[in-house]
């Protein structure tokens, strides 16, 4: 009898603890115009648990231990906001200006398997750039594409899933664990990041996502899920996640679209050593066809990491947040096309690891580029084919549809934009997939020259993981 009473008391105590949890709802908006901040994280201060993520309307719900708790809202480019909880909370983030990040970053340690996945994604970056090269300035985020494919591959099976696994270099379970670890690091759940990544699933209310696919997207990719599948909602989400750099992703949505899956990435950071705007002047730039044109080239002499590979030189210009722009400049007797035809990520990584600090005389163009890149022919060229074929695509784990009704990827594209100036860089990309789915003696530094006065390849790279966030070419046109 005593044991039964003790057990009953324990059950009542546990029930009381569970009941003590309070679910708080609220919205996160920007201070300037009260627009919803989509994809902001809201976490309970002092509690180790995954944060809530705001939806398309900036709304969130989160369990707190009691009404004395505090929550903290964060979104890239905004100062964090901490508030005591209350029902129907309104959290206003100050969007007056992008804060200069601290030099402190979250720590991350990748396992051997995770390093292998990252290597595959970085190698994919170069294969992708080769596939789209048309001797035109371009900008891409291969990481955005890889993350989106990793998320939606949880809804695939058979050959459709296998082809994506081959491209990404891992099985779905490994991809899920990798991005669950990488996204919080890159998007700055701590101080010091000016990079954000967000995922969204806009679902046609006529169909219902399968629970396993839905939960994998939310838990591993922090996906925002909405049944409001329309042009305005999709474009509003894209504009919000890219701070207006990609304001319009879709023009129309087919009524038979089951799902539009999106990944958005945004980067904004200052150079560690800014260029003097007064030093920017028109200088001859040699186009791919040999023609010379006057372009605004920025100039500075400073200490940078510099290396030389087979037929090219490499320069790494650091940002304040732990990332760098890495530029590969073909030798004068070579060309960017020749470099692209043979170079691999392993080649670049070897030169990167052997690079030394030099005093470099830099000439580099101030430029902007905006590209819309259709991805279906590119993916097919890279071996991913069945997802685009209604007769062969297998998305049986994606949603509940009538037996025999095909679900396939009817559209896949990426829009990307980059702005490079004397003070720093802004870059954004949205990928869409629609389913119809060192104090010793002062060191002596070598003097080097890096005059980017001809076409070159560039990357924005995280210095800790080596992850390529953006990659592109500049031809000067």
What are these regions (language model features)?
Residues 98-228:
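Detector for small/aliphatic-rich hydrophobic stretches
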Residues 48-59:
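Short, acidic Ser/Thr/Gly-rich low-complexity loop/linker segments typical of extracellular
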Residues 85-104:
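Extracellular beta-sheet/turn segments enriched in Thr/Pro/Gly and aliphatic residues
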Residues 14-23:
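Beta-strand-rich domain onsets/edges
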Residues 22-24, 31-45, 66-68:
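Short, ordered, surface-exposed loop/turn motifs in non-cytosolic proteins
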Residues 60-62, 89:
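Short strand-edge motifs at loop-to-beta-strand transitions and within beta-strands
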Residues 44-47, 72-84:
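A short, solvent-exposed loop/turn motif at the edges and junctions
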Residues 135-136, 145, 178-333, 353-442:
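Non-catalytic, conformational "gating/processing" segments within enzyme and secreted inhibitor domains
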């Amino acid at each position: 009898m005593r044991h039964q009473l003790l057990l009953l008391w324990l059950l009542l105590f546990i029930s009381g603890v569970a009941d003590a949890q309070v679910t708080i709802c609220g919205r996160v908006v920007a201070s300037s115009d009260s627009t919803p901040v989509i994809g902001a994280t809201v976490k309970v201060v002092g509690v180790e648990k995954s944060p809530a993520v705001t939806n398309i309307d900036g709304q969130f719900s989160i369990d707190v231990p009691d009404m004395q708790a505090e929550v903290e809202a964060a979104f890239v480019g905004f100062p964090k906001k901490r508030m005591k909880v209350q029902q129907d909370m309104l959290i206003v983030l100050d969007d007056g200006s992008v804060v200069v990040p601290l030099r402190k970053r979250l720590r991350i340690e990748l396992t051997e398997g995770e390093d292998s996945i990252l290597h595959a994604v970085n190698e994919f970056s170069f294969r992708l750039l080769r596939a789209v090269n048309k001797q035109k300035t371009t900008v891409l985020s291969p990481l955005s594409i890889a993350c989106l494919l990793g998320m939606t591959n949880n809804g695939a099976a058979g050959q459709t899933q296998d082809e994506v696994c081959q491209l990404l270099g891992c099985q779905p379970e490994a991809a899920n664990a990798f991005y669950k670890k990488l996204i919080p690091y890159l998007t700055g759940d701590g101080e010091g990041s000016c990079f954000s990544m967000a995922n969204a699933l806009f679902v046609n209310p006529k169909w219902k996502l399968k629970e396993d696919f839905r939960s994998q997207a939310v838990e591993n990719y922090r996906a925002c899920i909405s049944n409001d599948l329309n042009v305005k909602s999709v474009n509003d989400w894209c504009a919000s996640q890219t701070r207006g750099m990609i304001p319009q992703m879709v023009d129309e949505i087919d009524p038979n679209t089951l799902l539009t899956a999106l990944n958005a990435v945004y980067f904004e950071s200052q150079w560690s050593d800014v260029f003097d705007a007064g030093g920017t002047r028109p200088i001859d730039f040699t186009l791919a066809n040999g023609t010379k044109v006057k372009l605004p080239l920025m100039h500075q002499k400073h200490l940078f990491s510099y290396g030389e590979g087979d037929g090219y030189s490499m320069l790494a210009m650091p940002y304040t947040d732990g990332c760098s722009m890495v530029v590969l400049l073909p030798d004068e007797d070579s060309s960017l096309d020749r470099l692209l035809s043979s170079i691999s990520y392993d080649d670049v990584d070897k030169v990167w690891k052997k690079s030394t600090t030099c005093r470099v005389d830099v000439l580099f163009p101030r430029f902007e580029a905006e590209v819309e890149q259709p991805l279906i022919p590119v993916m097919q060229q890279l071996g991913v084919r069945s997802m685009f074929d209604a007769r062969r695509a297998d998305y049986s784990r994606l949603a509940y549809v009538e037996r025999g009704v095909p679900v396939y990827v009817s559209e896949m594209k990426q829009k990307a934009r980059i702005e490079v100036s004397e003070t720093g860089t802004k870059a954004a990309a949205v990928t869409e997939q629609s389913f119809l789915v060192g104090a010793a003696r002062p060191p002596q530094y070598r003097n080097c020259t890096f005059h980017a006065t001809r076409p070159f390849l560039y990357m924005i790279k995280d210095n800790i993981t080596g992850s390529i966030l953006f990659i592109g070419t500049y031809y000067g046109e």
